[in-house]
Amino acid sequence: MIVLAAAMSLLVACDDAPREAAKPSAEGKPTLSDVPPPLVPAMPLPDNAVDNAVAKLDSIADDLMKKSGVPGLAVAVVHGGKTVYARGFGVKDIRAGDAANNRVDADTVFQLASVSKSISSTVVAHQVGVNAVGWDTPVVEKLPWFALSDPAVTKMVSIGDLFSHRSGLPDHAGDMLEDLGYDRRYVLDRLRDQPLDPFRISYAYTNFGLTSAAEAVAVGAGKPWDVLADDVLLKPLGMTSTSYRFGDFGARSDRAVGHIHVDGKYEPLYTRDPDPEAPAGGVSSSVNDMTHWLAMVLANGTYAGKQIADPKALLPAITPQIVSSPASEPAMRSGFYGFGFNVGTSSAARTELSHSGAFELGAGTNFVILPSADVAIIALTNATPSGVPEALTAQFADLVQFGEVREDWYQLYNKLLAPLEKPVGSLVGQKPPANPAPSAPRSSYVGTYHNDYWGPARVSEKDGNLHLELGAKLAVPLINWSGNVFTYEWVSENSPPGSIGKATFDGNKLTLEYYDEDGRGTFTR
């Protein structure tokens, strides 16, 4: 069996060039292929597949803009090492109308949100290739202060574990601390308070888990993450409009302003500063810049004749490391996650690399790479995620592989993403009681209520009204609902418009419902 396994491995590895399924001979008989079976897709590409698909992108983009109402969109395609399409649609900021300098073009800079994870993965791949770290390097070797709730996991958890979301940390652990304005180190320190699922066999998507791994790589390099990324990836690729620093994004004149979806309209109401989780969600870039990165990934780590990432270090990132979307029936294909990349198999039996990015406050992004077709596409929007970039790239991938669009992708993705806009809180949709119970004197609620995880909550009184402060960002009036129950409204990345916070006082205790999902929402005076 060992000999057989070795032979099969050799068969798979003997030729890694993109190949097509054999086409029938002139006599109509099938032509047998000598390409290793794992490299053969289920069907050949249509003639002129990429050119024909590119020719339809303008109409696809226009249609999706009309259906969704998103303010701005930019799209680019790389094929054969060249940019074959790059164009913008719509506007950067709806307040400025259709002025020429407000129109989106291929150089307009967007926030990429979680597409940043894939870019960060290639930064790490560079470092792995020069033997600065390994995907299997334990994080505590570089960050001695880092800890999770299980000492054994703390000792073993590696850079690769955190880049593949298999550390056992809960889904989006730490994100709500970021919403409150805490800095990166504070959030990473609090990861030790999180309960863990089984190590290396559980998948749960975490921004700050990945960020901790990136921080370890940066410390190992002796420079901040944003500087490391500049030095080993962005500058060598000539990505002059790309940065991990939110300040750089804000300083650019040609930037797309984020728009949030409120009451059926998109409005530029909020600013999303992702610096605390920059390796996971902080990149800003244009589609023209992103074509350089896509070309590098398609070329197995090389760009313009220069090796950016060692192919052996890049390969683990773009191949499955854990099942992220298990099949629900035998005939279904499972989805996988590599190191910072979604990895799957299309219905044409082609490997597909992808990632989406989503900021509720105003960014929706996606890229798709089909290595066997030597093509990649990226789509960026400046609006609450609605499925537009995913639908556009999926339609393009269908056209490349089949010559036609085979699903109503916008309907599928729009339905999938709709829950992101759902307000949170048990009092949402309820009317205040007609005859509320009287509350205690306002002064009796005043004070500082302590919580080891969320930090101190400060309740103050001004002109007979109560105010709540928590972290650096939450500062809201408290409105009496009934008795010792008060409410507040606050919009953040994880608290969409219409959400209602519930604050319940009980002597020297204050329970904030929004922060109590896992039982940690009680503060003590």
What is the predicted role of each segment?
Residues 1-2:
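Bacterial N-terminal signal peptides that target proteins for export
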Residues 15, 394-525:
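Peripheral terminal and inter-domain segments
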Residues 47-110, 129-134, 141, 149, ...:
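Short, conserved catalytic-motif segment at the N-terminal edge
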Residues 15-22:
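Bacterial lipoprotein signal-peptidase II cleavage site
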Residues 10-13:
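C-terminal motif of bacterial Sec signal peptides marking the signal peptidase cleavage site
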